[in-house]
Each structure stands twice: as structure tokens, then as C-alpha cells.
Amino acid sequence: YWLAKNDKKYSNCYELLDEWMQHFSYGIISASVSLAEERGACDAYADTRWAEGKLPKDMTTPMYDSLFNYEEKLDWTSLRARIAKYGVRNASMIAMFPAETSAKISGSGTTNGIEPIRELIISKGGKNRQAKFVVPELARLKDKYDRIWDHTSCEALIKTYAVIQRYTDQAISVNTYYNKQ
């Protein structure tokens, strides 16, 4: 939904997504540091990469850096200093999951996770119950949504996940699709 609202597809969202993920990651980490300042660092803090001064964004590879080189918009140096002083309250903070195939979020005004939608309207459920799910703002954005079956390659999806992974401290589960057209 967020990509459709911003007139982006998985193939051209990387810079905007990087900026959004910076804010998302920074906010979560900062909140954990504030909790650590108030209540103390988590018990396992000394055994984490956080204690080594490493942030999720520091774990990129040369391949990532050759694909994406976006400006950092936030003061990561100050956040790193706060972590060094107070620690973090949560050893693990940021997880992403694909979710489009399994989530059943209804009426929330959003789509189900980070992978593309399968269809604009879809039926999901178990053996005893089926429910229809309609993408948000269908009438206005129907031509803006990026459907998984519109992709003939996984490249854009994998690059999108790479941008997201840079700012998460846990591995992302990735579903890939193949449209043999």
C-alpha cells in the first residue's frame, strides 16, 4: 500500500524505501536506548553486536554498497554514542516478514507485509472460514499496485528486500515467485 500511495513499484522504490527504513530503524533503536536509560540494558547486552558498537546498517556487504549508495539522513553517530553509554533494552528489535501469503489482517487499511500483493481482491481463510481482502483505496490506486505476478524476474523484489535488510537486526524470510510468461 505504501508503495502504491507513493507512486512507486518494487523496481524504482529503493531510495525512498531507504529513507523510510532509516527513520523506522532509528526510531526503534532510539526507543530501546531510552528504555535502557530508564530501566537498564538487557541482560545479554554485553554479548550483542550492539555492545560492539555495531548497528544493523553497518552489516552491509561490498555488493550492497555497489548497488545502493544513499545519503544518511539521520544522526547515527549520536545514536551510537547513546548506545555506548546506556546500552539497549532489547537485544533483538526489528524483524520483517513477507506475510502476503499467510497474514490475515482485515480492515486495517494496509496490505500484509513487505512482499507484493497477489491480487487486488483475494479470498483467504482456513477450512471453516473464508474472508475477502481488498487492497486499501482500490478505486484510486488500482493501477499503482505492484502485483507479484506482474514480475517476470525476482531482481526488483530481492533488491527491495536488501534495502529493508540493511536496517533490520534479524534475517528476513523471503518468498520468491516465478511467472513463466
Where are the model-predicted features located?
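Catalytic alpha/beta core of large soluble enzyme barrels
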Residues: 37, 41, 58, 65-73, ...
